[in-house]
């Protein structure tokens, strides 16, 4: 019988604790039905010593180490190979937790030394543990991956004082978590700006980062001229995002300029994707 990580974790816990009774769930129901493990009494599965022996053998067909040895199922495949027979069965994504950077006028500070990454079309992935975080001087977080790859085409729209920043992709899933972790350990004096779609969802992303540490949001300098009928406006996208207005409106301590932008976006039903924001000219930086 082939078992997944969830089933193996459940079996490992029972073997570690030498548990004789467990609540029925999908895993134990399957093991009882397919392998006649345990006896069902009411809503529990009762395990004998011989049942535990069978479970230990079954566990050993998937895992090299004894059940008493704890390992991280989210580790990379090289680390997982020390424990799992099938190293591909882990939960880790190869690049899932790495931070993706690009730059024009900045070096990427690593613990092993500074790295030159300012080449057109070049992005660099690095784990947080290898970053010399204390040497990051300025950071711009970008929502869109394509914008990161093509940074050399549009960076001059960023205010001059921000053009020597490191540019970081916000990512999705585990990438987002890594970005949050970076923000938590950045030096307090390091300015951070967030450049997203010009819409409620983008403003919400920036606002959530601001809960971790103070950040600014980059918006089109011409934001006041963007109305519902603007050729780059996506009204239907605004409708999909209307749920975010309540959370944003309830944010305490929001700056007056940020309130004005939020009011404008909501009143005019604005949703301009970042690629289209890029067509609108210079950006301005607004403290949240």
What label would you give each PLM region?
Residues 1-189, 201, 206-288:
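Nucleic-acid enzyme cleavage-core boundary/entry regions
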Residues 195-197:
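Terminal interaction module
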